[in-house]
């Protein structure tokens, strides 16, 4: 079942044509990887799905991004959209407050004030992010004292606390060590049971390990999109084959 349908999506930074007629369906219960060389448009595309590009001047968008049957650029309030479409960034960005308050931040903004209810949300979110057992005895400690990998999982917990329906990840492990990377990759396999995940990654091995579907971007276009096994082992376009095999990138 499709949760997002992208139809003829183009994006311009001023006169620069950054995304060119993108068509793609994102399915439930899957991890979709976006791969391609630097500057190919994959992060711009990711930010188009929750309207993060709205913060950039001189951006113009054509086409449609359909989420639950509605065009996000015409029929959605952007605040509500970003609650329903969570985002995890390349660099962990915990707020300068306690671990507890980091996770409770979103629910509080959306009107939840009851302490018992917040306690339940915080514990549930940290457990889903595979972090609870490591920090349950220091919830009132400053979140910025956590390790890099723990901080990134905290950011995932913070995203989960507002009950999103889709999770976007922009190179979430690029600054992490192999052990922390492995934990987050395992977490993605668990999360996809409840949340579709779209991840930008420069790591071909990672894309192969974690994703069900893969889209290869080049110069603002989707060159090829399909099952990850097909993209990696039976690409239909020579450019895809060249990129996967390391001939450029």
Swiss-Prot record:
Entry keyword set: ATP-binding, Cell membrane, Membrane, Nucleotide-binding, Phosphate transport, Translocase, Transport
GO terms (BP aspect): phosphate ion transmembrane transport
Enzyme class: translocase
Described purpose of this protein according to its UniProt entry: Part of the ABC transporter complex PstSACB involved in phosphate import. Responsible for energy coupling to the transport system.
Pfam family, one: ABC_tran
GO cellular component: a single term: plasma membrane
SUPFAM superfamilies: P-loop containing nucleoside triphosphate hydrolases (SSF52540)
Record family assignment: Belongs to the ABC transporter superfamily. Phosphate importer (TC 3.A.1.7) family.
Gene name linked to the record: pstB
EC number: 7.3.2.1
Mode of membrane association: Peripheral membrane protein
Annotated ranges, domain ABC transporter: 4-244
Quaternary assembly: The complex is composed of two ATP-binding proteins (PstB), two transmembrane proteins (PstC and PstA) and a solute-binding protein (PstS).
Protein name: Phosphate import ATP-binding protein PstB
MF-aspect GO terms: ATP binding; ATP hydrolysis activity; ATPase-coupled phosphate ion transmembrane transporter activity
Reaction catalysis annotation: phosphate(out) + ATP + H2O = ADP + 2 phosphate(in) + H(+)
Lineage: Bacteria, Bacillati, Bacillota, Clostridia, Eubacteriales
Subcellular location: Cell membrane
CDD domains: ABC_PstB_phosphate_transporter
Chain sites annotated for binding ATP: 36-43
């Amino acid at each position: 079942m499709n949760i997002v349908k992208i139809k003829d999506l183009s994006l311009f930074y001023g006169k620069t044509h950054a995304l060119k007629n993108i068509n793609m369906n994102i399915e439930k219960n899957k991890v979709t990887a976006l791969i391609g060389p630097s500057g190919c448009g994959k992060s711009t595309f990711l930010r188009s799905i929750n309207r993060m590009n709205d913060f950039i001047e001189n951006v113009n968008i054509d086409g449609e991004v359909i989420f639950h049957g509605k065009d996000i650029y015409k029929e959605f309030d952007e605040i509500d959209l970003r609650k329903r479409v969570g985002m995890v960034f390349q660099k962990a960005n915990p707020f300068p407050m306690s671990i507890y308050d980091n996770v409770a931040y979103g629910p509080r903004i959306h009107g939840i004030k009851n302490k018992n209810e917040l306690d339940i949300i915080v514990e549930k979110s940290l457990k889903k992010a595979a972090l609870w057992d490591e920090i349950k005895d220091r919830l009132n400690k400053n979140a910025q004292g956590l390790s890099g990998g723990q901080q990134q999982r905290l950011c995932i917990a913070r995203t989960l606390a507002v009950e999103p329906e889709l999770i976007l990840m922009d190179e979430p492990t690029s600054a992490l060590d192999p052990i922390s990377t492995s934990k987050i990759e395992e977490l993605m396999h668990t999360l996809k049971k409840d949340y579709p995940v779209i991840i930008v990654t420069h790591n071909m091995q990672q894309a192969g390990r974690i994703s069900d579907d893969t889209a290869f971007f080049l110069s603002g276009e989707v060159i090829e999109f399909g099952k990850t096994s097909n993209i990696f082992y039976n690409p239909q376009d020579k450019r895809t084959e060249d990129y996967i095999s390391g001939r450029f990138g």
